[in-house]
Amino acid sequence: MHDGEAEQDGFRRIFFGEPTIGGRFSALSPFGLVPAAVMGLDLGRIAAEAEVMGEACRRPDAHANPGVALGLALGLAARDGRDKLTIVTSPEIYDLGAWLEQLVAESTGKRGVAIIPVDLESLGAVDGYARDRVFVSLRVAGPWDAAPEETLQA
């Protein structure tokens, strides 16, 4: 839809994004921030936290760089046959898992090697999983259900 059509159709606001930004790079552009604002999220806090993480990921010391640590952990796991990443989130942020699933899927899968993200899967018994999985647990601060965490610890 073009802006003229949107005005004609009575849209209250039109937000323009940079068309060259896409996919995994769009979270902090209007493509990601407008929906976040509509949801009532604190954009100032999101921007501040993103800046902190951006600075941390620019650290030249690999031991102090969380981006390097994450890439290394996932890369080594995949090299050792753990090519499935199961994402477990607390209920308040369950939609984050879908976004991470997309992010991982489009960021890996190069040169015939991929990490397959799995989201919204109910956790089963530990012995029901093959040794091809890596689990990540993301939760918000506060009260939480210990059952998924206990399963992951096993």
Q: Residue spans of the language-model regions?
A:
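Active-site phosphate/pyrophosphate-binding segments
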Residues: 1-136, 141-146
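Extended, charge-enriched "interface" segments that sit outside catalytic cores
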Residues: 142, 150-154
